[in-house]
Amino acid sequence: MPLLDSFKVDHTKMPAPAVRLAKVMKTPKGDDISVFDLRFCVPNKDIMSEKGTHTLEHLFAGFMREHLNSNAVEIIDISPMGCRTGFYMSLIGTPDEKSVVKAWENSMQDVLKVKSQEDIPELNIYQCGSCKLHSLDEAKQIAQKVLNSGIGVMNNAELKLENL
């Protein structure tokens, strides 16, 4: 089985919160697809809570689209990592990391402004597969931690695992 790109970087050296351009690929028609690692927690040191991560999944995708989408960039998907240390963001286009950082910061500010559980999008039995697995308070704690820590930019060359 081929080794996935996410397993070719040294997780013991990853800072968090931080952005990493994980890969850029071309579609058959020549469009760029970029995949970003949005690392909220230092791997193997901390994880996001299950309910907080799920609530962030509902909020973060919309807020990031508001702050990052443009004529040159369109977010395809933002999904939580199984290890609960971050999210992967796939998009059409090639925004620079500073633009992604700014959009992430603004999105975390937006999370803090959400007033109640009722304001979480798609939080119902028809649109969510685990609609009781949410916590706005935990999502706000994650957002505040990101903002307090500041978001950095990872360097792929420094994270590359040798001998792969």
Curated annotation (Swiss-Prot):
Class of the enzyme per the UniProt entry, highest EC level: lyase
Assigned keywords, A-Z: Autoinducer synthesis, Iron, Lyase, Metal-binding, Quorum sensing
GO molecular function: iron ion binding; S-ribosylhomocysteine lyase activity
Essential cofactor(s): Fe cation
Cofactor notes: Binds 1 Fe cation per subunit.
Summary of the function given for this chain in its UniProt record: Involved in the synthesis of autoinducer 2 (AI-2) which is secreted by bacteria and is used to communicate both the cell density and the metabolic potential of the environment. The regulation of gene expression in response to changes in cell density is called quorum sensing. Catalyzes the transformation of S-ribosylhomocysteine (RHC) to homocysteine (HC) and 4,5-dihydroxy-2,3-pentadione (DPD).
Family affiliation: Belongs to the LuxS family.
Self-association state and partner proteins as the record states: Homodimer.
Protein's name according to its UniProt entry: S-ribosylhomocysteine lyase
